[in-house]
Amino acid sequence: MEREGKSDPIPIDIILDILSRLSTNSIAKFGLASKFCGSILRGQDFIELFLITRPLSRPRLLFAVQNSDKWCLYSSPQSQFPDENHSLVVSADFHMELRRDMGQEIFGLVSGLLYFPNTRTGEVPVICNPSTGQYARLTQRSSMNNLSSLLGYDPIGKKYKVITPSSSHFDPENILTLGTGKVAWRSIRCLVDHYPESEGICINGVLYYMASNKFQFSGVKIASFNVRYETLKFLNADVDVTFCPALAKLINYKGKLCVLSCLWDNQIYPKPLRWKVLMLWLWVLEDAEKEEWLKREYTLPVNIVHGNVSVVGVTATGEIILSMDYTSESFFVYYFNPERNTLEKVEIQGFEGSEKNLSSRVYTFVDYAEDVKFI
């Protein structure tokens, strides 16, 4: 029997099936092996197959700890029913280390990717996949102005876009689409020049953020940018909603935009107690078309929340999650159920000693799940 000189190529569907069963770290290494491998893993067919073949896992909390010389990423289980009987101490799993020069701050976890805007340093923005460790530095814009940039995601077209809202007519390059093979800034026309005053939150393909422009409108407004159609509008909201962007955070509240402010108040209880309590104010955009807002106000139970904390998000069932801002000997995450008015404190162990004798900044993100998107 004569042996043929060439064997038949392996069908692409078999290759996809084999790759989908690898760990995320192995997938990341395979994607760097060649352009052919990378093109397979960037394809939507592989991404969808990966999600199908993986068992459904509960969402997790992702922690990005900013040490002096590196970023350290951890994750821990995200409690599903924090006001029921469960362990109040959970361990954080170490994921990976990232280079410190990737950025000074993180502007959100957007559909599985971390975004380092690098506005303060003037460096180009960086996008990173915390599941694989893969990252990409964006191309430099022709303008050298240190403009704030934001990352949005179009779930229909499955495209990420970076926008740099400008307050100058002399800075035309303001949008970058990723994953097209043509990494170049281009121009879209915004009817009103403005400057972002907050991080953004992308909900169902709409990127929301607070914006200002002292020359064209007073105060701060909420910008609404449709990532797919690249259209911009400003929402009508009471001045109470945007009175202080530094204290407010835009979050996804059960699929709706919510502006949440938290503030310590020691005037509620009379002397000599003067206990500090944490007040939460929520403005939920109940009807986006009519721009109708619903205000809610909560007082968290006394003497449970300690230290510098921030609201980091809301679970699918409506629990508001607060997290400490810096590492310490004991690090806590808090789950507040507004319907039951319950507050549970969960200790996170595993990264409290990531850098001895230093208090490191911690960025916490909710609903984290493994993702193999390649940039």
Swiss-Prot record:
Every F-box domain range: 5-52
Origin: domain of life: Eukaryota
InterPro entries referenced in this protein's UniProt entry, alphabetically: F-box-assoc_dom_typ3, F-box-assoc_interact_dom, F-box-like_dom_sf
NCBIfam families in UniProt: F_box_assoc_1
Protein name: Putative F-box protein At5g52620
Record organism: Arabidopsis thaliana (Mouse-ear cress)
